[in-house]
C-alpha cells in the first residue's frame, strides 16, 4: 500500500460504490458520480418537480459560475471564451465546420486518435482538405519534432489528444503549441482523457481550441462538456450553428435583425444542459477543494504502482509509455495466453469489478480515490485466470 493511502477514507466516502465492494477502474470510459454531484442533481430535479419549477435566475448564476470554474481549471483569465457543449465531438465539429477551408489544406492528426478527433475533420475532405496521419514511434508516442517535420506550406491545423485513449500516451502540449505558434498554425486539443487526470494550461500551451466532454476524469454527468476558443481562433471562426440565443438581446423576441454574439457565445444556440452544468459545477469545486495537484499526484502514484507490478510479470506486454511525463491515468497491456480480453472483462464485471478491454488489450484507469489494494486484487485475478 502506498504511504498515506489510508487517508483516502474521506475521498472514498464520496463514492457509494466503494462501500459494497465494487472495484471501479474504468474512469477512461466513464466515472462514477460523487455524493456531492448526485445531491446537486437531486436538488435541481426536486426544484423542477416540487419547488418553484422555473428558476432561471439561479440557473444562470450557476452557468456563469461554472464557466468561471472551467476557466480557472484550464488556466485562462477569459471565461467568455468558454462555450458549453454536449460532448467532445460537438466541440471539435464546431471548430472544423466553422473554419473556411481551401482545396489542398492539410490537417495533421495521428493514427492513434479516438474517432471524435478524426471524423469532424474527415468530413472536410469534401472541400479538398487532406488529413495527414502521423505514425507513433516504437514507444507509442507522437513527439513534437515529428509534428514539426510533417508541416508543409499547406498545413493549417494540428489536432491531438492530450492523452490517447488506448495506450495512454500524454502529448507534450507545450512544445507542440510552440511549434504551431512558430508556423502560425491552429492548435486543437481533445482534452477528454487528460482533464481531471493531468493539468492542461491553455495559455502556456498556446492552445487555440480545447474540446472535452466531462463524464470521464472530470466526474460529471454525461452530455455536458465545453469548448475553449483562443482569441486567435475566434477571429477566424464562423459559427457552424445558430439559434435564438445567438444574438445580443435574445429576449427581444420580435427583433430578428439583431447583432450576433461573439462566436464563443453564439455557439450556445438554445437551452443548455442545466442539470449537467450543475453536476460539473460541483465536481469542479470538489477538485479545487481536494487540490488539483493532489488529485493528479494520487493518480500518478496508482499508475506507477500498476506499471511496476506489471513489469514483474513476464507474460505482460505494456503499451503505455514508460516515462512518467509521457502518461497520465491510463495503463494498457496485453497478457500472453489470454484468449479474449473482452470475455475476461465481462466476467470481472459480473463479480463487481470494472476495467475495460480495448482493441485486444486490457486497460486500467484509476482515479484519485482508488487504492493499491484494489489494483492488486484485479491484477491477481488477471494473472490467476
Model-inferred region functions:
Residues 1-385:
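Pyridoxal 5′-phosphate
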